[in-house]
C-alpha cells in the first residue's frame, strides 16, 4: 500500500509561525444576526516577519458559523506549507428584547389590537420578526395572562425556546372588547340567534316572555349576559316587542316581535241549564 502526503513547513509550529485571529482574543462578541461570521485570520512566518498569502499559502474555512452555538475556524497550509490549525468561537443567541425584534398581534405591533369577546379563550394571530424576517414559530412559545377569555386587556408573551437563535422573552398587550348582540334593530349580530317565542298570554296586564339567546351556538344566561325589556306588550292581538340588551361581556341590543293571545283562564264558559235530544229511528237526533 502507498499513501500520499505533502512535505512542507508546518504552520502549527509555534517556533516558526504565528497564527492570529484577533476577534477571538480581543473580546469580540458575536450575536446571531442571520449572517455568516468569519473572523479574519493571518499566518505569519516569524523569521523575517513575513505574512503568508491567504488562498495561496493557506486556506481558511468556517463551520457552524451562522446560528447560535459553537462555530469553528480552520486554517490549513497550502503549497509548501502543511498542517491544520483550529479554534472555536461562540455565537450568542439574539435577545427578543432587541430593538430589531418585533412582536405583532393581529398584524399590529403597538399593543392596540382589539378583538371581540367570543365566550372562549381568545388567541389571535401572533408573529415574531427579526430585522423584518419572520421567526419560525418552532423557535418560541406564546403564553397569555391569567384571563384571555373575558373582556379587558390581555398580556401576551413570546418566549424563545432553548437551543434556538434567540433567548429571553418579549411581551405586548391586546384588548378583548364587548361582543355586540345587535345594533338596536331586528337583526341579531353575526353569531347571535334568538330562540322562538310562542304566543304569550297577558299576566297581570302584560306579556313578558324571556326568549333564549345564543352566541356561536352557546346559550347565554338571562340576567348575566342579557336582560329583556318590552314595548306594546299589554294588548291582545298586537305585535308586541321584546328588546334583548347585552350586559356583562355583551353590549348592544336586538328586538324581536311576538304575539299576545287571550288567556283561557280569563274565558267565561256557559252551559245551558237543560240540554236533551230526541233520537229518531234513522239514527239522527234532534237537539232541544
For each feature predicted by the language model, list its residue ranges.
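Serine/threonine-rich, repeat-prone extracellular segments and beta-strand-based repeat modules
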Residues: 1-6, 50-82, 87-89, 133-167, ...
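Solvent-exposed, low-complexity, repeat-rich "mucin-like" stalks and linkers
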Residues: 4-49, 93-133, 177-218, 263-288
Amino acid at each position: 500500500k502507498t499513501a500520499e502526503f505533502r512535505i512542507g513547513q508546518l504552520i502549527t509550529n509555534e517556533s516558526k509561525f504565528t497564527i492570529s485571529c484577533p476577534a477571538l482574543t480581543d473580546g469580540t462578541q458575536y450575536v446571531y444576526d442571520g449572517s455568516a461570521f468569519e473572523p479574519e485570520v493571518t499566518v505569519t512566518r516569524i523569521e523575517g516577519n513575513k505574512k503568508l498569502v491567504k488562498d495561496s499559502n493557506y486556506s481558511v474555512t468556517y463551520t457552524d458559523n451562522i446560528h447560535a452555538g459553537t462555530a469553528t475556524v480552520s486554517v490549513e497550509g497550502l503549497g509548501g506549507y502543511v498542517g491544520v490549525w483550529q479554534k472555536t468561537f461562540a455565537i450568542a443567541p439574539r435577545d427578543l428584547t432587541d430593538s430589531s425584534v418585533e412582536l405583532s398581534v393581529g398584524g399590529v405591533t403597538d399593543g392596540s389590537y382589539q378583538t371581540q369577546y367570543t365566550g372562549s379563550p381568545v388567541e389571535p394571530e401572533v408573529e415574531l420578526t427579526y430585522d423584518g424576517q419572520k421567526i419560525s414559530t418552532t423557535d418560541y412559545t406564546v403564553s397569555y395572562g391569567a384571563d384571555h377569555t373575558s373582556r379587558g386587556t390581555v398580556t401576551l408573551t413570546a418566549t424563545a425556546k432553548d437551543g434556538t437563535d434567540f433567548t429571553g422573552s418579549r411581551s405586548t398587550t391586546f384588548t378583548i372588547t364587548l361582543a355586540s348582540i345587535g345594533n338596536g334593530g331586528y337583526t341579531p349580530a353575526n353569531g347571535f340567534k334568538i330562540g322562538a317565542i310562542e304566543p304569550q298570554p297577558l299576566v297581570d296586564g302584560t306579556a313578558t316572555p324571556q326568549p333564549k339567546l345564543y352566541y356561536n351556538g352557546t346559550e347565554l344566561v338571562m340576567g348575566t349576559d342579557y336582560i329583556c325589556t318590552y314595548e306594546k306588550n299589554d294588548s291582545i292581538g298586537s305585535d308586541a316587542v321584546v328588546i334583548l340588551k347585552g350586559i356583562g361581556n355583551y353590549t348592544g341590543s336586538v328586538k324581536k316581535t311576538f304575539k299576545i293571545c287571550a288567556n283561557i283562564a280569563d274565558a267565561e264558559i256557559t252551559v245551558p241549564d237543560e240540554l236533551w235530544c230526541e233520537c229518531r229511528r234513522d239514527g239522527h237526533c234532534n237537539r232541544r
